[in-house]
């Protein structure tokens, strides 16, 4: 993660692979399913560099991207990238919350669709399911420890709860309403914030007034979100 290191440049110039249209570094047989890094040593190596690697006319990663974040070759529009937003500490825009769908963490559509990486799918993608209710019932620190290999903004497990709320609201079950209502009493303003949106998403926004003390709410972030959602309801009537 150090910008002073030219990992991608060294990777390509050493003949290990090439940069795909998804912006991922690809290798024959592995595709994008790899991590690259540098080891600096006081020795020179002669390397026969192959420069004939390329994606050619393939654009499956661009076709598979659910938001159009890869519409331009070799450019990733992070503002449209689901994986970026699920790891961001910033407020996720309303349109992106919709597009996140049932995803809890990350989005691998561009990796899964990449032909050179088909052999890595079975190896790296075994069990991708999570229990969203379990996530929401866990303490923040428990989540940080449980998913310690994840990048979690500010090492705050409430961001994982945020992701779970969005996924749950986009794919509600019979108990989703009660789950979201219970979260309105959370001590975390982040959890309360997205729970309000979650109830709006499943058509239960009017119940927020019964369980959330809006008049005495001190969080400006929550008050603004409540007002915004309220205006969206009336603008659609």
Predicted features by range, described:
Residues 127-158:
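Flexible internal linker/loop segments at domain or repeat junctions
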Residues 118-122, 219, 223-225, 229:
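Alpha-helical scaffold segments
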Residues 161-171, 192-202, 224-236:
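Structural detector for internal amphipathic alpha-helices that build alpha-solenoid repeat scaffolds
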């Amino acid at each position: 993660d150090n910008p002073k290191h030219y990992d991608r440049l060294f990777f390509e110039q050493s003949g290990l692979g090439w940069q795909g249209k998804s912006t991922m570094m690809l290798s024959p047989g592995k595709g994008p399913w790899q991590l690259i890094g540098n080891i600096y040593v006081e020795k020179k190596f002669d390397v026969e560099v192959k420069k004939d690697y390329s994606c050619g006319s393939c654009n499956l990663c661009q076709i598979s991207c659910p938001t159009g974040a890869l519409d331009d070759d070799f450019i990733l529009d992070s503002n449209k990238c689901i994986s970026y937003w699920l790891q961001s500490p910033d407020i996720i825009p309303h349109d992106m919350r919709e597009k996140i769908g049932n995803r809890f963490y990350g989005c691998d559509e561009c990796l899964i669709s990449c032909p050179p990486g088909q052999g890595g799918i079975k190896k790296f993608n075994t069990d991708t399911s999570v229990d969203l209710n379990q996530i929401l019932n866990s303490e923040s620190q428990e989540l940080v420890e449980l998913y310690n290999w994840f990048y979690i903004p500010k090492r705050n497990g409430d961001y994982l709860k945020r992701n779970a709320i969005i996924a749950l609201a986009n794919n509600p079950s019979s108990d989703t309403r009660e789950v979201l209502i219970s979260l309105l009493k959370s001590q975390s303003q982040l959890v309360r914030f997205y729970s309000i949106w979650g109830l709006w998403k499943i058509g239960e926004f009017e119940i927020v007034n019964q369980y959330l003390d809006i008049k005495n709410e001190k969080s400006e972030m929550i008050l603004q979100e409540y007002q915004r959602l309220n205006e969206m309801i009336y603008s659609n009537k």
